[in-house]
Amino acid sequence: MGHHGQMHAQHGVTMPADSPIGQPDRSEQRYFPATAFRTRRSTLSDAQRQTWDRRWPELGLSVGPAEDPDRPGPPLDTDAWFGRKAPVVLEIGCGNGTSTLAMAKEEPGVDVIAVEVYRRGLAQLLCAIDRDNVTNIRLIRGNALDVLQRLIAPASLTGVRVFFPDPWPKARHHKRRFLQPGTVGLIADRLLPGGVLHVATDHAGYAEHIADVGAGEPRLRPANPDSPLPISVARPTTKYETKAQDAGSAVTEFIWLRR
């Protein structure tokens, strides 16, 4: 386990009470990232396309930009989607789903919603779900900020995972980093009391930024390493992480609890 964020006084974005699912105040948009993902072409293999066509209608959901972002509509009915009532974890930026699949298998009593903008990564995960007959994962293709704002109800998530988000290392691109005060505030709003925000990064500069942003959100507190948690925080080591460590990059992890 890596380092936890240290607490100091800052303030995150506030959520107006009159919004159906806590839409952030328009005046606070500077607290949110600009485009937080890169444009990428994604081509599926024939096998991936066949699995996609067969399983996506059941397990997947595509989310585009809202026509009227001030009226996000009703939140997602996760009990109906999964066919049961269970703790729900939202994983933001699941990539090809290596960690998603492994962690879902280890906790069959926890339902996982994996969000990713790139179709190829989702297709790889969907094929693995189909191959291994995993029943506790659902997929959303779209911008995670749209998902949090429009589909997730306040105080509905047991956990949120953000593993190795794009660090956007150039200073002029820092505004594109996903974990900004507004985003972390929105995540805190969506977590149940006692819920977990679990973040990992291998970029030292982004780690400092994340520590500051997390410390500035008053609804979050660093988890005590000895305290029991409602979900597992044991991640598998991915090929990407191994490559980063071989290159000399240290992985920093943050685990916060919703107050």
Curated annotation (Swiss-Prot):
Entry binding sites for substrate: 170, 202, 238-241
Record family assignment: Belongs to the class I-like SAM-binding methyltransferase superfamily. TrmB family.
Active site, UniProt feature: 166
Ranges where the record places region Disordered: 1-73
Organism annotation: Mycolicibacterium paratuberculosis (strain ATCC BAA-968 / K-10) (Mycobacterium paratuberculosis)
PROSITE patterns xrefs: SAM_MT_TRMB
Any GO CC annotation of this UniProt entry: tRNA methyltransferase complex
Residues where S-adenosyl-L-methionine binds: 91, 116, 143, 166
Segments forming a coiled coil: none
Functional pathway: tRNA modification; N(7)-methylguanine-tRNA biosynthesis
Domain of life, source organism: Bacteria
Annotated InterPro entries: SAM-dependent_MTases_sf, tRNA_(Gua-N-7)_MeTrfase_Trmb, tRNA_methyltr_TrmB_bact
EC number(s) per entry: 2.1.1.33
UniProt keyword annotations, A-Z: Methyltransferase, S-adenosyl-L-methionine, Transferase, tRNA processing
Protein name: tRNA (guanine-N(7)-)-methyltransferase
Top-level enzyme category: transferase
Catalytic activity: guanosine(46) in tRNA + S-adenosyl-L-methionine = N(7)-methylguanosine(46) in tRNA + S-adenosyl-L-homocysteine
UniProt keyword annotation of tRNA processing present: yes
Gene: trmB
Gene Ontology terms for molecular function: tRNA (guanine(46)-N7)-methyltransferase activity
Functional note: Catalyzes the formation of N(7)-methylguanine at position 46 (m7G46) in tRNA.
